[in-house]
Amino acid sequence: MQLLYDLTKMNYSALYGEGRYLRIPAPIHYADKFVKALGKNWKIDEELLKHGFLYFI
């Protein structure tokens, strides 16, 4: 999780070059949101995470 968060600090949400456009996959964006929520002392229901819910969006 920390690695994904560190990747978001690179600020490469979109890359441009020579007529090409590349977007970073959404999981990195959502990992950033998740880590920030944990930093705000959110209480995380582990059962919801087991089922794949992304309730921190």
From Swiss-Prot:
Origin superkingdom: Archaea
One Gene Ontology term of the molecular function aspect: nucleic acid binding
Pfam family, one: Piwi
Keywords of the record: Toxin-antitoxin system
Task of the protein: Possibly the antitoxin component of a type II toxin-antitoxin (TA) system. Its cognate toxin is VapC4 (Potential).
Name this polypeptide is given: Putative antitoxin VapB4
Encoding gene per record: vapB4
